[in-house]
A protein has these predicted regions:
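A polyanion-binding, active-site-adjacent surface
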Residues: 1-172
Length: 172
């Protein structure tokens, strides 16, 4: 495997005090954790109420992993703007995603779905489920999005097995 430096994703590290107000407000609510989950709709789920089906699937995965309390954190790659002129518009902010990952003390990111993985900086051709790499000094795992898991429920078990194997391999 190439050294981690060769697999960096370009972003400008932004200090939390320079983040837009909506990102600062969310950061104040998010707890630190070694394992960070992200998906395209996460910002919406955190700020406007979680989609029940996504919440059910995510809870099932997290519970099945049997990680100690305080392991998981959730940090979005997208967040809807909160200013009147931008109401409802969702944009991805790679710089704020990776700055947040650093701020939260994350060692491993689980990116659910192609859209989120591309938003955080993976080249489209590198995005595939049940794959891992080292990017920006953290382990980045890509898995299916919620729609793909719902299409084939056995994928949920595949995600759990893959992540548990990663934990063992990396001693996390």
């Amino acid at each position: 495997m190439p050294p981690a430096a060769a697999l960096s994703i370009s972003f400008t590290r932004t200090a939390p005090e320079d983040w837009p107000a909506s990102w600062q407000k969310l950061r104040a609510r998010v707890k630190r954790g070694r394992l960070c989950w992200t998906y395209w709709e996460l910002g919406q789920d955190l700020c406007r109420g979680a989609d029940p089906e996504r919440l059910r699937v995510l809870a099932q995965i997290v519970t099945s992993l049997h990680r100690p309390a305080g392991t998981n954190t959730f940090w979005p790659c997208t967040l809807a703007a909160l200013t009147d002129g931008e109401q409802g518009r969702t944009a991805f902010r790679r710089d704020l995603f990776w700055s947040g990952v650093r701020e939260l003390g994350v060692r491993m990111v689980v990116s659910m779905g192609d859209q989120a993985s591309i938003a955080i900086g993976l080249p489209k051709e590198a995005v595939q489920p049940l794959h891992w790499d080292i990017r920006n000094g953290v382990i980045l795992c890509t898995v299916w999005d919620f729609v793909r898991i719902a299409e084939q429920p056995s994928r949920l078990d595949d995600v759990v097995v893959f992540l548990n194997n990663m934990f063992r391999l990396l001693r996390l």
